[in-house]
Amino acid sequence: EKSKSLFTFPVFFKRNPYTKVIRNKSKKFIDIIQSKEIDYDLKSGECDCGFFIFKTSKVRKLVKHLINKKMIFSKKSNEVEFLSAFKYIRKLGKITTVNAKSEKDTIGINFKKDLIWRKFP
């Protein structure tokens, strides 16, 4: 069955999340914020797991436009912030989240040493 979502990603509810999904009253995705970009602590909330599935051509075209227009650059680090594109992506199509099974799913892999605890089949 073909998904009607433009963009899908897993989330997990936790304390002190690095990122937090913002939803409206009917639980639809609105935005995602990062603790490093705000001036207050995130006490709890749904965070992303750093894994995203999307319809590449539409999202890539939009993200390229957002970068060219300097609309998704971090105010603090001047880096491109992919998560900042989500509020624009949702205007193109449906964003769906699925619940991750454990908090381990939210741990990022940024360095080779981060793979040590992972068990692969």
Predicted features and spans:
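Conserved core of the sugar-phosphate nucleotidyltransferase
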Residues: E1-F73, A100
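Conserved alpha/beta core of the MobA/IspD/sugar-nucleotide pyrophosphorylase nucleotidyltransferase superfamily
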Residues: G45-P121
